[in-house]
Amino acid sequence: MTVRTRFAPSPTGFLHVGGVRTALFSWLYAKHHNGQFILRIEDTDRERSTQESVQAILDGMAWLGLNFDEGPYYQTERYARYQQVAQQLLEEGKAYRCQCSKERLEALREAQLAAKEKPRYDGHCRNQSLPDSGIPYVIRFRNPDAGIVSFHDEVYGDIHVDNSELDDLILVRSDGHPTYNFAVVIDDWDMKITHVIRGDDHINNTPRQINLFKALDAPVPVFAHLPMILGEDGKRLSKRHGAVSVLQFKELGVLPHALLNYLVRLGWSHGDQEIFSVQEMITSFDLKNVSRGVSSFNYDKLYWLNQHYQKSDSPESVANALQWHFEQAGIDLNQGPDLKDLVAVQAERCKSLAEMCQISQYFYTDIIEYNEDAVKKHLRPVVLEPLMVLHERLKALDEWKNDKIQECINDVSLQFDLNLGKIAQPLRVAVTGSGTSPSIDMTLALLGKNKSIKRLEDALEKIRARASVV
């Protein structure tokens, strides 16, 4: 048997982290078993489905590297197939037309609630032979009257539901459109899905869907339902917790494999291992190690993993991802150091690519923004003379290298009997505009000689202006 899994999002909003974890687990299971992973877009909600959301799903999957073997299939392109199967079920007596009005169904629901009964359809039209007479009708599934639906969930274990608890669900609405529970069964059947891995919010649908599979003499897939992901406050993950869309994490500067590594550990474990390459995930993944407990999304842990990969990945690969952030900021990368050289010194100082871009823009711009507090603290008249001497020493350098730059700084600090920080920190503010940067010799080396000398000259003018006021 060839394992075939699927990811079936609805294009009614962004691709959120819960959906991404479902896609990841489905993808990993298929890859682990040398199977196939199918993407299906469940776009039957015509009012809420948008092409923008479809594109966001495709873009998110591509960014994460979750490539699919088939698809994307669209449910809206399969309406004829759903109608065909519905007609087949009608002819076999496994479905029936229901002409109950909304008013009758609402009155039934209110009466059942008043009697403290579970709201459900009462089968009013079940045994009536209603022709297609032009009166609006829905098509309902004739659910078995007796017996038990039993299935083994790969996460939750054995589950048993009495058929008496299930009513006759609607397969086709009065406008001819299929319902979710009907379309998904036909799709999984036609697409030969062997394993359905999805969120546990679908677990209550499973007994109904199993009855449909059996009514169609279709093979019933294996089911695995994943517990939900909560925010750190124990509430369902939402926008109030921060980024929840996969492409928002790209904007925040999270590397795609860092996000995958983080998500795979939300509800799945392999011993005490925390760091997984994508290939290690594929090799190790097993549904038996998926936890039944809910998971909490921890941004600190995600950024810890992200920084790990920023430091352990090659500077070239991190630079490729970082380039997008500079482009979004409108920064001309031709005006500064090679990005891989920047990554080599900044990776361990930042938790994300977005932060790395933000704190490194002074390397690529002609004009820098000065932190006024840093200017007041470090660009004082007392450092004017040492910085003037340092300016001349640096300007005279034939080789603009770290060791030569550091040698100049050391010599000037000795000449003026200053602690090294008393000269290095004013120099840092002069060339970066702030009091933080990589080591001062590395900062100047990356900036280049011309830019460093020009900024030091501008800072000297600032100090002279300040001295004249004093």
Swiss-Prot record:
One of its GO terms (molecular function) is tRNA binding. A motif ('KMSKS' region) lies at residues 236-240. It catalyses: tRNA(Glu) + L-glutamate + ATP = L-glutamyl-tRNA(Glu) + AMP + diphosphate. ATP binds at residue 239. It is an enzyme of class 6 (ligase). Keywords: Aminoacyl-tRNA synthetase, ATP-binding, Cytoplasm, Ligase, Nucleotide-binding, Protein biosynthesis. One of its GO terms (cellular component) is cytosol. One of its GO terms (biological process) is glutamyl-tRNA aminoacylation. Disulfide bonds: none annotated. A motif ('HIGH' region) lies at residues 9-19. InterPro entries: aa-tRNA-synth_I_cd-bd, aa-tRNA-synth_I_codon-bd_sub2, aa-tRNA-synth_I_CS, aa_tRNA-synth_I_cd-bd_sf, Glu-tRNA-ligase_bac/mito, Glu/Gln-tRNA-synth, Glu/Gln-tRNA-synth_Ib_cat-dom, GluQ/Sye. The keyword Membrane does not apply. Its EC number is 6.1.1.17. Coiled coil: none annotated. It is found in: Cytoplasm. The keyword Lipid metabolism does not apply. It comes from the Bacteria. Monomer. Belongs to the class-I aminoacyl-tRNA synthetase family. Glutamate--tRNA ligase type 1 subfamily. Catalyzes the attachment of glutamate to tRNA(Glu) in a two-step reaction: glutamate is first activated by ATP to form Glu-AMP and then transferred to the acceptor end of tRNA(Glu). This is Glutamate--tRNA ligase. The lineage of its organism: Bacteria, Pseudomonadati, Pseudomonadota, Gammaproteobacteria, Legionellales. The gene is gltX.
